Amino acid sequence: MILSDGLIKELISYRALVIEPLSETQIQPSSVDLTLGSTFLAIDNINVPFLDPKRKETIKYREIHIEKGGQLILQPGFFLLGTTTERLMLPNFLVARVEGRSSLGRMGILIHATAGYVDPGFCGQITLEISNVNNIPVALYPGMRICQVSFELLFENCVIPYGLKGKYQGQEGPEGTRIFLDFLKE
């Protein structure tokens, strides 16, 4: 069951669901609009012939910070990691789904390549996988509404919430891949 605005507001009022900072105007009929943070990570591909998920040293990022009132011009075909301004704390009985906004999609901006699913128990800012599939540059502004998150109720609390084993738990700002940790478990 996807939560309605009334249920979202009720869970927030009891602090069972935390979204901070949050304005009442961000709450939509069945989702919450999230805004774009001011820090981004771009893959640094200098002297790296390819990215290898097994080798952490092949995956390096350079940080980009946009000052308040500034803009980021995202070039065609370019990919970077961004973050939401808001920090979420999900209870063990909710799953969140992050989706792009239609208005930005119509300009060629995608906000996630694959990671639109947020597990119960997650706490932190949402890292966005932003790309421009248009053939012209697009301006993005910190603080603008960049995506929306909806919430689905589980039939029962999960047994192992994300916080007990999640490699991105507590992330602040955009977080680069930690896929190399998967290979250490094998």
From Swiss-Prot:
DCTP binds at R101, S102, S103, L104, G105, R106, D119, T127, L128, E129, Q148, Y162, Q171. The active site is at E129 (proton donor/acceptor). The keyword Nucleus does not apply. Pfam families: DCD (PF22769). InterPro entries: dCTP_deaminase (IPR011962), dUTPase-like_sf (IPR036157), dUTPase_trimeric (IPR033704). Belongs to the dCTP deaminase family. Homotrimer. This is dCTP deaminase, dUMP-forming. It comes from Coprothermobacter proteolyticus (strain ATCC 35245 / DSM 5265 / OCM 4 / BT).
